[in-house]
Amino acid sequence: MRAIGRRIDGAPAASGDEDWLALGLEAMRALDFERALTCFDEAVTAQPTSHAAWYSRGMAFYNLGDDTAALESFTRASGYQPQSHLAWYGRGVTLVEMGRIDEALEAFDQSIALEPDSYLAWLAKGMSLIDQQRWEEALVVLRGAIERHQGAAQAWYGLGVAHLQANHAGEALMAFERSVELQADFDLAWYGKGLALLQAERVEEALEALTAATTANPQCTLAWMRQAETLEQLGRLEAACAAYGQVVQHTPTTEPLHGQAQRQLQRLRP
């Protein structure tokens, strides 16, 4: 979800001589979130009722991973400007990171009510419904996101996930294919395509998609693991061991996936 939240082009426009706000937005575009936060702190000190400054401060905290401070800033922004759909959106994505999904969905609903054409709130709501395994509801909402922005690779990816979980392999495959057409290096969309192809029993094509996922992101351990399992089932044990080795290499030892891959390697290489 945090990747969705890193959208600063929709920040409220500065007005008057709000130099600190402008400098902060410039720093956000440069992905210098610490400098941006310093500027936004100055902005809210100079203009403590500026919802634009509070919203932007929230985005800086959000990108720095300080969700408690981000939520406080977004709450201040919505307090000063209750009609700000961006402030409600910011609250929503932060609440998702905090695991407060029901509250996040309420915030996204409020954002959509204020600005029905903002695809980001539709997208975030759809992905949150996926987190709650509410597949059919997610499908409806993600279609709404795509209607508003057909070029949103993340929305097509989410649509694919929901279709896959609802056992709609054909629809899932079409959605994942559209996602990677829009963003060729989207590793999770390639991974999803691989899963959809496996569900459709198109194993060789699935391996190609899983390989594309790990090419796009060599640390995509989910794709490495599924690739390894599939290769093992096909009897290609040397290639399977190499893929399990990639899982071990790229997964922290504290994560269950690391142990699973390590055990598979030990079993295949006694």
Predicted region positions:
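Terminal, low-structured helical/coil segments at or just beyond the last alpha-helical repeat
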Residues: 1-14, 233, 241-270
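Alpha-helical segment of the N-proximal tetratricopeptide repeat
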Residues: 15-52, 56-63, 93, 127, ...
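Helix-start (N-cap) detector for alpha-helical repeat units in TPR-like alpha-solenoids
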Residues: 17, 51-52, 85-86, 119-120, ...
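Canonical tetratricopeptide repeat
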Residues: 22, 56, 63, 90, ...
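Structural signature of tandem alpha-helical TPR/SEL1-like repeats
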Residues: 30-42, 64-76, 98-110, 132-144, ...
